[in-house]
Amino acid sequence: MQILNTLTIFFVLACNILHKTTNFAPSIRIYFVTMIDTIINAALRAGRAIMNIYNHPDLDWQVERKADNSPLTLADRESHRVIAEALEATPYPLLSEEGAHLPYDERKDWHSLWIVDPLDGTKEFLKKNDEFTVNIALVTDGVPVMGVIYVPAKHQLFWGEKGQGAFTAEVDPETLHVGKPEALPLKGADWGRPFRVVASRSHLSPETETFITDLRRHHPDLEMVSAGSSLKLCLVAEGKADIYPRLAPTMEWDTAAGHAIALAAGRKVLDAQTDLPLTYNKEDLHNPWFVVK
């Protein structure tokens, strides 16, 4: 996948102008191939920037985690910089965990926007267990329509877009070449296994324990699996798990990319109380408790 050149960027901008001034449809395939290519390349390059810091032999990992010179802060900022520069040429504004959070009065009229977490999984990063991710999503009218999750330490890429399906592939960390994609859910991922719930084995909230107890009544052989950061949503999208209850606080940038991938894989991400789909670019950027299934 090639990084956008000037002509391609011009084409994207022209599409957006035509869409605003005519009946020209921005959803033609070449337009969205361009967009997905943009965010995949942004995620890959941001992941490389993170790994340069993660593997740096001279950094002090004892520094306070959010100090300006901590590895976490350096990686977060560098990833954000790479992504912001890549998305600057697109027609849409950016809402990022690391960037400035604009007041709702400025955001409420945004028809489409990027929602980004440049380094999701701070605990995983600090523990050096490799389960941190780069998350980029395109949200239109509150719905995630395109998303990319890159796991740079494991060289694994996930992406999905509305109407086009969801996929995963391995990435060459040296060249950033994306290997042969596999469609999600993975063929045979649910064959011959027990019903699986994504949850922390060691830090279950009382509400999650109750939720799992209720599930056991219907699935006595229930099995729990765990993963870091947005990889929890990917497990359900892959078909390696059946349900992920998140009965604890999260922010929109924690879930937007995974939500897009889950939707493209035929899954649902629902408010645990109302059973309605999660929405984005809300006045309050906190998510309600939710369930992925």
Question: Where are the predicted features?
Answer:
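Oxyanion/phosphate-interacting regions
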Residues: 9-10, 28-47, 209-218, 225, ...
